[in-house]
Amino acid sequence: MAKIAVLGNGSWGSVLGSMLADNGNDVVLYGNIDSVNQEINEHHTNTHYMKNWKLNPNVPATGDLEKALDGAEIILFVLPTKAVRIVAKNARKILDKTGATPLLVTATKGIEPGSKKLISDILTEEVYPNDSEKIVAISGPSHAENVAQKDLTAIACASTSEENAKRVQKIFSNNYVRFYTNDDLVGVEVGGAVKNVIAIAAGILVGKGYGDDAKAALMTRGLAEITRLGVKYFGAKPMTFSGLSGIGDLIVTATSQNSRNWRAGKQIGEGKSLDYVLDHMGQVVEGATTVKAVHELAEEKNIDMPISEAIYRVLYENADVDQEIKTMMGRNPKPEIQL
């Protein structure tokens, strides 16, 4: 059993926290919405994010970060990408006072715009400078709604430390979620982050009325882009993208109605603006943020990412979806396999 602080009490944070408590761990949820914390504490529900579902009754919620981190052996970050750095800074101040050195696990899937840093890089910079071995990333085909119902899945847990990856594997695994260790930390993170951009594209195709062939082709070429970025910019291992955090996460995120990125793309394909979609989603659409960083990375290293670049233009340069599709299908002929 471990004492675990889960930072972020949205849908995925709540489900992971409840699952970890079911596994026999001592868990506390941290979030900054008082009404959500109150509902979790009084009713063991989180209807703001998850309808018709109850958390493990032994999981309390708090808006006090110092209280949440008290005695924690593991800190699990399940925050929007834009919130990770500031919360990590605040966590470092608290940990410095106590001298505690908990393991940091990230379930956040994104790339920070501006810095173009992965979440593990942010946590290393802000909490454990020059000690990335204390960081573990978990990523794979895992929608909160499905895991909440104890549907079966498998997730990668990656770290530069085999010992820490195995520790997370042991603590997090149960009879419906199987964790596999992986030593390619950056590859696992890139797959989890950039697949959200491709999921928006897949949703756009559905919104425009395209069929299964188009979606399958998009996902396949999208995986090629994810791999290209991961290998060329971050030094990831190509095989990682054939695993749970690559093709596994991409399939579910680009096909499921539980995917907020897919739903956002579908509405854009139907003619709604990005501002409208973000205002009405009620949840974070990470792909809309990640695509900004991907655009900057692709330009900086001259990496060929036509799908991601098209999504950037549609979301932020008011490009016409139909014209972008026409342009993409009319590109110069190329071999299928190339990095």
Curated annotation (Swiss-Prot):
Main location: cytoplasm
Keyword Iron-sulfur annotated: no
Binding residues annotated for sn-glycerol 3-phosphate, in chain numbering: 109, 140, 142, 195, 249, 259-261
Gene Ontology annotations for the cellular component aspect, listed alphabetically: cytosol
Any GO molecular function: NAD binding
Pfam families: NAD_Gly3P_dh_C, NAD_Gly3P_dh_N
Residues reported to bind NADPH: 11-12, 109, 144, 260, 284, 286
InterPro entries: 6-PGluconate_DH-like_C_sf (IPR008927), 6PGD_dom2 (IPR013328), G3P_DH_NAD-dep (IPR006168), G3P_DH_NAD-dep_C (IPR006109), G3P_DH_NAD-dep_N (IPR011128), NAD(P)-bd_dom_sf (IPR036291)
Leading EC class: oxidoreductase
Enzyme active site: 195
Transmembrane segments: none
Alphabetical list of HAMAP family matching this protein: NAD_Glyc3P_dehydrog (MF_00394)
Family, similarity comment: Belongs to the NAD-dependent glycerol-3-phosphate dehydrogenase family.
Record's protein name: Glycerol-3-phosphate dehydrogenase [NAD(P)+]
Organism: Lactobacillus johnsonii (strain CNCM I-12250 / La1 / NCC 533)
Gene it is expressed from: gpsA
